[in-house]
Amino acid sequence: MGSLCSRNKHYSQADDEENTQTAEIERRIEQETKAEKHIQKLLLLGAGDSGKSTIFKQIKLLFQTGFDEEELKNYIPVIHANVYQTTKILHDGSKELAQNELEASKYLLSAENKEIGEKLSEIGGRLDYPHLTKDLVQDIEALWKDPAIQETLLRGNELQVPDCAHYFMENLERFSDVHYIPTKEDVLFARIRTTGVVEIQFSPVGENKKSGEVYRLFDVGGQRNERRKWIHLFEGVTAVIFCAAISEYDQTLFEDERKNRMMETKELFEWVLKQPCFEKTSFMLFLNKFDIFEQKVPKVPLNACEWFKDYQSVSTGKQEIEHAYEFVKKKFEESYFQCTAPDRVDRVFKIYRTTALDQKLVKKTFKLVDETLRRRNLFEAGLL
């Protein structure tokens, strides 16, 4: 009898402890749910190489504490890999052009650089790259200065040569220093393919200011095979920030060299717009890589892209660049309204000219995005 009472007392204490733990868990869940309601989700989308991951890194630098020394050091192998990959692309591209072009001779490497090129191409094809040494830098610089490589570079849009090629080649000595720690500029130029989902929480007016909105920004893989992973992020998103690299109108995809990058961006933009879960979602379109766009327009006709085949040049210099930009902007506006059902026209749609590497411009742009979304929230609450 006493034993039974003792057991009942024990069970009663256990139940009380369990109930207390359950109540605590429920309380914390309720608190977290309330806190989550005040956090606005932003989904950062765009095709591969649109510059969206650079935007993501800028947010970390601008509205958080940036990268600590350990994080910076983690970029060393990434930057070294970028150097080797760029070198391989240029070397292999020159070989291909030398075999297929009428003016093949200008793509032929000098005798002394031929062996160097083969060695560096082999390194660039490995899964694990060696640390960048002074001797390897000497070889890379010799290859980079070869007239055949410089001629190949002029055909970079056909060969998947990254935008950061010049930056890397100009900083080889610094990258190979035994005491090298990447700068924030190095990190911004570093290219690492986004696979899966990464997120960051920030406030454009500073975490300590109570009036500031808090955002959670999600960056997802841009290549085609990554897009199926986006679905679980779609519901309940405050805004989609869509990055379009407007400078890539004459380039093809990394994963499908038959497909024009701008056409892929157009199709992706329209696909996202038509998703039912975005019917009330605000859209912020970043027409990115304007710095490269303004350099390219005078050299490469905009109608090199099928989508822009009706483009007609009207002038030269800055006036022509502005005309070209406004044409591209109008094309995206037309796509937006064609893909937006009549009952969705009240959702916010804004277009921003951006250069992901320009920190001041990115900061200004996100302040404008913040202002737009705050006004939208006030309007929906009936306060405007």
Curated annotation (Swiss-Prot):
All copies of the G-alpha domain together span: 38-384
Identify the residues that bind GTP.
49-54, 163, 188, 194, 222, 288-289, 291, 356
Q: Which sites carry lipid of kind S-palmitoyl cysteine?
A: 5
Lipid moiety (N-myristoyl glycine) attached at 2
The record's annotation in PROSITE patterns points to: G_ALPHA
Q: Which UniProt keywords apply?
A: GTP-binding, Hydrolase, Lipoprotein, Magnesium, Metal-binding, Myristate, Nucleotide-binding, Palmitate, Transducer
Q: Name one GO molecular function term.
A: GTPase activity
Q: Where is this region: G2 motif?
A: 186-194
Which BP terms does GO give this entry? adenylate cyclase-modulating G protein-coupled receptor signaling pathway
Q: Which cofactor does it need?
A: Mg(2+)
Region G1 motif, as annotated, extends over 41-54
Which segments carry the region annotation G4 motif?
A: 284-291
Which top-level group of life is the source organism from? Eukaryota
> Which region ranges are annotated with the description G3 motif?
215-224
Q: GO cellular component terms? A: cytoplasm; heterotrimeric G-protein complex
- SUPFAM superfamilies, per this entry? P-loop containing nucleoside triphosphate hydrolases (SSF52540), Transducin (alpha subunit), insertion domain (SSF47895)
Specify which residues bind Mg(2+) according to the UniProt entry for this protein. Answer: 53, 194
Region described as Disordered: 1-22
Annotated region (G5 motif), positions in chain: 354-359
What does the UniProt record say this protein does?
Guanine nucleotide-binding proteins (G proteins) are involved as modulators or transducers in various transmembrane signaling systems.
Domain comment text?
The helical domain (69-189) is required for self-activation.
Indicate the family of this protein. Belongs to the G-alpha family.
Subunit structure comment from the entry: G proteins are composed of 3 units; alpha, beta and gamma. The alpha chain contains the guanine nucleotide binding site.
Q: What is this protein called?
A: Guanine nucleotide-binding protein alpha-1 subunit
